[in-house]
């Protein structure tokens, strides 16, 4: 379960046993949301948010912040997803300290 980003209390991560579509799990304060990144010709078309079946959902304000983060950093998330799931590379977590 590699952590890919930390952002003001949010943890962005992948579960290592998952598959397409490209998505990222976001956790904060014991809550979680999952953001699917929909691309067309390498460009962002849509971000689809869904809730976990096992963990309570992020509160709406946190979900909106997490979605804004995913929108801003989607290329980095996709690169890390491809490196981890396709190329089986080890990925490093990045701590973001500048508010978006």
Regions found by a protein language model. Name each.
Residues 1-12:
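Negatively charged, low-complexity tracts enriched in Asp/Glu with abundant Ser/Thr
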Residues 4, 43-50, 73, 77:
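Generic preference for hydrophobic/aromatic residues in regular secondary structure cores
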Residues 8-10, 31-33, 41-43, 74, ...:
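Generic structural motif recognizing short loop/turn segments at the entrances and edges of beta-strands
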Residues 10-12, 17-20, 40, 79, ...:
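Short linear sequence elements within intrinsically disordered, low-complexity coil regions
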Residues 11, 24-26, 38, 45, ...:
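Extended aliphatic helical segments
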Residues 16, 20-61:
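A short, structured beta-strand/loop element
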Residues 64-96:
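C-terminal structural segments of small proteins and small subunits
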